[in-house]
Amino acid sequence: MSLNKDLTIIFVSFYSKNIIEKPINQIDKEIPIIVVENSLDKDLKDKLEEKYSNVKVLIPEKNTGNGGGINVGLKEVKSKFVLYLDVDVELNKSTIETLYNNAEKLDNFSILGPSIKNFPYKNEFYLDKNIIPGVHSMNFITGCALFFNMKALNSIGFFDEKIFLYYEENDIYLRSLKKDFKILLIEAAEINHLGNSSTDLIQRDDIEINRNWHLMWSTFYFHNKHFGIIKAYEKTIFKFLSSFIKFIFFSVVQNHLKRKIYYARMSGIFNAMIGKDSWFRSSIKNNIDN
Protein backbone atom coordinates (compact mmCIF):
# COMPACT_ATOMS: atom_id res chain seq x y z
CA MET A 1 0.00 0.00 0.00
CA SER A 2 1.11 3.55 -0.71
CA LEU A 3 0.37 6.52 1.51
CA ASN A 4 0.16 8.85 -1.49
CA LYS A 5 -2.46 6.66 -3.17
CA ASP A 6 -4.40 5.62 -0.08
CA LEU A 7 -4.80 9.04 1.56
CA THR A 8 -6.53 12.33 0.74
CA ILE A 9 -6.27 15.48 2.87
CA ILE A 10 -9.32 17.73 3.32
CA PHE A 11 -9.34 21.32 4.55
CA VAL A 12 -12.50 23.38 5.01
CA SER A 13 -11.79 27.08 4.57
CA PHE A 14 -13.97 30.05 5.48
CA TYR A 15 -12.34 33.37 4.59
CA SER A 16 -8.94 31.76 5.21
CA LYS A 17 -7.11 32.96 2.10
CA ASN A 18 -4.48 34.71 4.23
CA ILE A 19 -3.53 31.49 6.05
CA ILE A 20 -4.56 28.53 3.88
CA GLU A 21 -1.20 28.14 2.15
CA LYS A 22 0.62 27.50 5.42
CA PRO A 23 -1.21 24.22 6.18
CA ILE A 24 -1.03 23.17 2.52
CA ASN A 25 2.75 23.59 2.59
CA GLN A 26 3.00 21.10 5.47
CA ILE A 27 1.71 18.30 3.23
CA ASP A 28 3.84 16.17 0.92
CA LYS A 29 3.27 17.39 -2.64
CA GLU A 30 2.42 13.85 -3.76
CA ILE A 31 -0.60 13.59 -1.43
CA PRO A 32 -3.85 14.87 -2.97
CA ILE A 33 -5.49 17.75 -1.11
CA ILE A 34 -9.07 18.96 -1.32
CA VAL A 35 -9.89 22.47 -0.08
CA VAL A 36 -13.59 23.19 0.39
CA GLU A 37 -14.01 26.97 0.31
CA ASN A 38 -17.16 27.76 2.27
CA SER A 39 -16.91 31.50 1.62
CA LEU A 40 -17.55 30.72 -2.08
CA ASP A 41 -14.36 32.60 -3.06
CA LYS A 42 -13.70 31.53 -6.65
CA ASP A 43 -10.55 33.66 -6.87
CA LEU A 44 -9.00 31.49 -4.16
CA LYS A 45 -9.80 28.39 -6.21
CA ASP A 46 -7.95 29.77 -9.23
CA LYS A 47 -4.98 30.88 -7.14
CA LEU A 48 -4.47 27.61 -5.25
CA GLU A 49 -5.04 25.28 -8.19
CA GLU A 50 -2.57 27.25 -10.29
CA LYS A 51 0.08 27.17 -7.57
CA TYR A 52 -0.31 23.59 -6.30
CA SER A 53 -0.64 20.64 -8.66
CA ASN A 54 -1.94 18.37 -5.88
CA VAL A 55 -4.68 20.77 -4.70
CA LYS A 56 -8.29 20.75 -5.86
CA VAL A 57 -10.58 23.51 -4.56
CA LEU A 58 -14.30 22.81 -4.33
CA ILE A 59 -16.82 25.65 -4.15
CA PRO A 60 -20.13 24.41 -2.71
CA GLU A 61 -23.41 25.96 -3.81
CA LYS A 62 -23.86 27.36 -0.30
CA ASN A 63 -22.10 27.37 3.05
CA THR A 64 -23.39 24.33 4.95
CA GLY A 65 -21.00 24.64 7.88
CA ASN A 66 -17.90 22.70 8.79
CA GLY A 67 -19.46 19.24 8.77
CA GLY A 68 -21.27 19.95 5.52
CA GLY A 69 -18.03 21.26 4.05
CA ILE A 70 -16.20 18.09 5.02
CA ASN A 71 -18.99 16.11 3.36
CA VAL A 72 -18.41 18.00 0.10
CA GLY A 73 -14.81 16.78 0.17
CA LEU A 74 -15.66 13.25 1.32
CA LYS A 75 -18.02 12.76 -1.61
CA GLU A 76 -15.13 13.46 -4.01
CA VAL A 77 -12.47 11.15 -2.60
CA LYS A 78 -11.58 7.73 -3.96
CA SER A 79 -8.91 6.92 -1.39
CA LYS A 80 -9.00 4.35 1.40
CA PHE A 81 -8.36 6.97 4.09
CA VAL A 82 -9.05 10.69 4.54
CA LEU A 83 -7.37 13.11 6.94
CA TYR A 84 -9.43 16.19 7.76
CA LEU A 85 -7.43 19.10 9.23
CA ASP A 86 -8.46 22.50 10.55
CA VAL A 87 -6.48 25.21 8.77
CA ASP A 88 -4.80 26.24 12.05
CA VAL A 89 -3.30 22.81 12.79
CA GLU A 90 0.47 22.40 12.82
CA LEU A 91 1.78 18.92 12.04
CA ASN A 92 4.93 17.24 13.25
CA LYS A 93 7.07 15.75 10.49
CA SER A 94 5.87 12.22 11.22
CA THR A 95 2.21 12.92 12.11
CA ILE A 96 0.63 11.82 8.84
CA GLU A 97 2.87 8.79 8.42
CA THR A 98 2.23 7.69 12.01
CA LEU A 99 -1.54 7.93 11.57
CA TYR A 100 -1.37 6.07 8.27
CA ASN A 101 0.83 3.28 9.63
CA ASN A 102 -1.53 2.76 12.55
CA ALA A 103 -4.53 2.77 10.23
CA GLU A 104 -2.96 -0.01 8.17
CA LYS A 105 -2.54 -2.31 11.17
CA LEU A 106 -5.58 -1.49 13.33
CA ASP A 107 -8.95 -3.19 12.90
CA ASN A 108 -12.57 -2.08 13.21
CA PHE A 109 -12.00 1.64 13.61
CA SER A 110 -13.85 4.53 12.02
CA ILE A 111 -11.73 7.49 13.12
CA LEU A 112 -8.20 8.00 14.41
CA GLY A 113 -7.14 11.18 16.17
CA PRO A 114 -3.65 12.49 16.97
CA SER A 115 -2.62 13.70 20.40
CA ILE A 116 -2.68 17.48 20.77
CA LYS A 117 0.17 19.39 22.34
CA ASN A 118 -0.83 20.93 25.70
CA PHE A 119 -4.32 19.42 25.49
CA PRO A 120 -4.70 16.44 27.84
CA TYR A 121 -7.98 14.56 27.50
CA LYS A 122 -10.23 14.16 30.52
CA ASN A 123 -10.66 10.63 31.89
CA GLU A 124 -14.35 10.67 30.92
CA PHE A 125 -13.37 10.63 27.23
CA TYR A 126 -11.48 7.31 27.50
CA LEU A 127 -13.37 4.07 26.96
CA ASP A 128 -10.33 1.81 27.18
CA LYS A 129 -6.76 2.99 27.74
CA ASN A 130 -3.86 1.32 25.93
CA ILE A 131 -5.73 -1.30 23.94
CA ILE A 132 -2.22 -1.56 22.58
CA PRO A 133 0.57 0.65 23.97
CA GLY A 134 -0.09 4.28 23.04
CA VAL A 135 -3.47 3.61 21.42
CA HIS A 136 -6.63 4.45 23.37
CA SER A 137 -10.29 3.77 22.64
CA MET A 138 -12.27 7.01 23.06
CA ASN A 139 -15.84 8.29 23.07
CA PHE A 140 -14.66 11.77 22.05
CA ILE A 141 -11.65 13.30 20.33
CA THR A 142 -11.13 16.90 19.30
CA GLY A 143 -12.39 17.50 15.78
CA CYS A 144 -9.49 19.62 14.52
CA ALA A 145 -7.74 16.55 13.04
CA LEU A 146 -9.70 13.44 12.09
CA PHE A 147 -8.31 10.45 10.19
CA PHE A 148 -11.23 8.59 8.59
CA ASN A 149 -11.47 4.97 7.54
CA MET A 150 -13.70 5.46 4.50
CA LYS A 151 -15.08 1.92 4.52
CA ALA A 152 -16.38 2.43 8.06
CA LEU A 153 -17.53 5.98 7.34
CA ASN A 154 -19.60 4.85 4.37
CA SER A 155 -21.33 2.42 6.72
CA ILE A 156 -21.93 5.04 9.44
CA GLY A 157 -22.89 7.90 7.16
CA PHE A 158 -21.21 11.28 6.77
CA PHE A 159 -21.76 14.38 8.91
CA ASP A 160 -25.35 15.42 9.66
CA GLU A 161 -25.82 18.51 7.49
CA LYS A 162 -28.68 19.75 9.63
CA ILE A 163 -25.94 20.71 12.11
CA PHE A 164 -24.18 23.84 10.89
CA LEU A 165 -21.81 24.29 13.83
CA TYR A 166 -21.11 22.44 17.11
CA TYR A 167 -21.95 18.83 17.99
CA GLU A 168 -21.30 17.60 14.44
CA GLU A 169 -18.40 15.52 15.75
CA ASN A 170 -20.36 14.28 18.77
CA ASP A 171 -23.09 13.12 16.42
CA ILE A 172 -20.80 11.15 14.13
CA TYR A 173 -18.90 9.67 17.09
CA LEU A 174 -22.10 8.43 18.69
CA ARG A 175 -23.32 6.92 15.42
CA SER A 176 -19.92 5.27 15.02
CA LEU A 177 -19.95 3.72 18.49
CA LYS A 178 -23.53 2.49 18.02
CA LYS A 179 -22.27 0.51 15.00
CA ASP A 180 -19.36 -0.88 17.06
CA PHE A 181 -16.63 1.02 15.23
CA LYS A 182 -13.80 2.29 17.42
CA ILE A 183 -12.61 5.88 17.76
CA LEU A 184 -8.91 5.72 18.58
CA LEU A 185 -6.41 8.22 19.94
CA ILE A 186 -2.87 7.69 18.62
CA GLU A 187 -0.41 9.15 21.13
CA ALA A 188 2.64 9.01 18.86
CA ALA A 189 0.95 11.18 16.23
CA GLU A 190 1.12 14.71 17.62
CA ILE A 191 -0.19 18.04 16.38
CA ASN A 192 -0.35 21.59 17.65
CA HIS A 193 -3.73 23.30 17.39
CA LEU A 194 -3.17 27.04 17.30
CA GLY A 195 -6.81 28.06 17.53
CA ASN A 196 -5.99 31.55 16.23
CA SER A 197 -8.46 33.85 14.54
CA SER A 198 -7.44 35.70 11.36
CA THR A 199 -10.24 38.25 11.63
CA ASP A 200 -10.30 41.66 13.25
CA LEU A 201 -12.21 42.63 16.41
CA ILE A 202 -15.50 43.55 14.71
CA GLN A 203 -15.48 40.35 12.69
CA ARG A 204 -14.70 38.30 15.80
CA ASP A 205 -17.74 39.86 17.48
CA ASP A 206 -19.90 38.79 14.56
CA ILE A 207 -18.46 35.27 14.69
CA GLU A 208 -19.00 35.10 18.47
CA ILE A 209 -22.69 35.93 18.06
CA ASN A 210 -22.94 33.30 15.32
CA ARG A 211 -21.21 30.68 17.48
CA ASN A 212 -23.49 31.26 20.45
CA TRP A 213 -26.62 30.89 18.33
CA HIS A 214 -25.41 27.61 16.86
CA LEU A 215 -24.09 26.22 20.14
CA MET A 216 -27.55 26.52 21.66
CA TRP A 217 -29.41 25.27 18.58
CA SER A 218 -27.10 22.28 18.19
CA THR A 219 -27.21 21.41 21.91
CA PHE A 220 -30.99 21.00 21.72
CA TYR A 221 -30.96 19.27 18.32
CA PHE A 222 -28.25 16.73 19.23
CA HIS A 223 -29.83 15.68 22.52
CA ASN A 224 -33.30 15.51 20.99
CA LYS A 225 -32.00 13.39 18.11
CA HIS A 226 -30.16 10.85 20.24
CA PHE A 227 -31.78 10.97 23.69
CA GLY A 228 -35.26 12.41 23.22
CA ILE A 229 -37.15 15.64 23.79
CA ILE A 230 -37.04 15.51 27.60
CA LYS A 231 -33.23 15.33 27.65
CA ALA A 232 -33.05 18.17 25.13
CA TYR A 233 -35.16 20.40 27.38
CA GLU A 234 -33.13 19.38 30.43
CA LYS A 235 -29.96 20.47 28.64
CA THR A 236 -31.25 23.83 27.45
CA ILE A 237 -34.12 25.23 29.52
CA PHE A 238 -31.91 26.70 32.24
CA LYS A 239 -29.56 28.08 29.59
CA PHE A 240 -32.56 29.79 28.01
CA LEU A 241 -33.68 31.32 31.32
CA SER A 242 -30.13 32.39 32.20
CA SER A 243 -29.69 33.97 28.77
CA PHE A 244 -32.99 35.85 29.17
CA ILE A 245 -31.89 37.32 32.51
CA LYS A 246 -28.49 38.30 31.10
CA PHE A 247 -30.12 39.78 28.00
CA ILE A 248 -32.23 42.06 30.22
CA PHE A 249 -29.23 43.01 32.36
CA PHE A 250 -26.93 43.86 29.44
CA SER A 251 -29.74 45.80 27.76
CA VAL A 252 -30.07 47.95 30.89
CA VAL A 253 -26.31 48.58 31.20
CA GLN A 254 -26.08 49.11 27.40
CA ASN A 255 -23.47 46.47 26.68
CA HIS A 256 -24.57 45.93 23.10
CA LEU A 257 -22.28 43.00 22.28
CA LYS A 258 -23.31 40.98 25.34
CA ARG A 259 -26.95 41.82 24.70
CA LYS A 260 -26.66 40.47 21.15
CA ILE A 261 -24.84 37.34 22.33
CA TYR A 262 -27.49 36.40 24.89
CA TYR A 263 -30.29 37.21 22.48
CA ALA A 264 -28.60 34.88 19.99
CA ARG A 265 -28.44 32.12 22.63
CA MET A 266 -32.16 32.48 23.37
CA SER A 267 -32.98 32.53 19.67
CA GLY A 268 -30.91 29.42 18.97
CA ILE A 269 -32.67 27.43 21.70
CA PHE A 270 -36.13 28.72 20.76
CA ASN A 271 -35.70 27.90 17.07
CA ALA A 272 -34.55 24.37 17.91
CA MET A 273 -37.46 23.88 20.30
CA ILE A 274 -40.03 24.78 17.64
CA GLY A 275 -38.32 22.55 15.08
CA LYS A 276 -36.83 25.20 12.82
CA ASP A 277 -33.70 24.45 10.82
CA SER A 278 -30.33 25.91 11.76
CA TRP A 279 -30.76 29.07 9.70
CA PHE A 280 -28.61 31.71 11.43
CA ARG A 281 -25.52 32.80 9.48
CA SER A 282 -22.64 35.20 9.99
CA SER A 283 -22.98 38.55 8.20
CA ILE A 284 -19.29 38.68 7.22
CA LYS A 285 -18.93 39.78 3.61
CA ASN A 286 -16.58 38.62 0.93
CA ASN A 287 -14.17 41.52 1.30
CA ILE A 288 -13.21 41.05 4.95
CA ASP A 289 -9.69 39.87 4.12
CA ASN A 290 -8.94 42.78 1.78
PLM feature segments, named:
Residues A145-F148, A152-G157, K162-E190:
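A short, conserved alpha-helix in the catalytic core of glycosyltransferases
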Residues K93-E124:
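Conserved donor NDP-sugar-binding/catalytic core segment of glycosyltransferases
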Residues Q26, E37-D46:
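A conserved acidic beta->alpha catalytic loop
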Residues V82:
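Short aromatic/hydrophobic "clamp" motif used to bind/position activated sugar donors
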Residues I131-F148:
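A recurrent flexible, glycine/aromatic-enriched loop bordering the glycosyltransferase active site
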Residues F11-K29:
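Short, well-formed alpha-helical segments that are part of the catalytic scaffolds
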